[in-house]
Regions:
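Short beta-strand elements in bilobed, periplasmic/extracellular small-molecule ligand-binding domains
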Residues: 1-9, 69
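Short, well-ordered alpha-helical scaffold segments within catalytic/effector domains
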Residues: 8, 12-16
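Flexible loop/turn connectors
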Residues: 14, 20-124
Length: 124
């Protein structure tokens, strides 16, 4: 795991560190934001890695530039998250007591060009 402050530059730096470590040889990186994943794609390419042939990269957010980068992403529907959070706050402000509970939120896996099966697992 690397810390990358949710920016393209942070994702780039962290991926350079990760891929520069001779003790690890990942076939995939799951990144905590699309911005960082874009930086990871750029770093991998600068190091001569082919995305996705040598390294699959997936982000989270559904960023509008994801299609340009060919980035596989998990889209989270922030409008729905915000609406549900606002409703919970309004109920609390009205004095309504709500027990703690889990809320299942929708998401969508958007598969693009940054992911594939690892080479050693492809049929011969």
């Amino acid at each position: 795991m690397r810390v990358a402050n949710f920016t393209i530059a942070g994702g780039y730096r962290s991926t350079l560190q990760l891929l520069g470590d001779p003790r690890v040889s990942p076939t995939a990186i799951f990144v905590a934001s699309d911005e960082m994943a874009m930086g990871a794609i750029m770093a991998a390419r600068d190091l001569g890695k082919r995305v996705p042939d040598d390294l699959s990269i997936i982000g989270i957010d559904g960023h509008e530039l994801g299609d340009f980068f060919g980035l596989t992403t998990v889209s989270q529907f922030p409008e729905t998250q915000g609406r549900l959070a606002a409703e919970a706050v309004l109920h609390a402000l009205d004095g309504e007591s709500m027990p703690a509970h889990n809320v299942d939120l929708p998401f969508e896996l958007v598969v693009r060009r940054s992911t594939s099966v690892p080479k050693d697992q492809l049929p011969a």
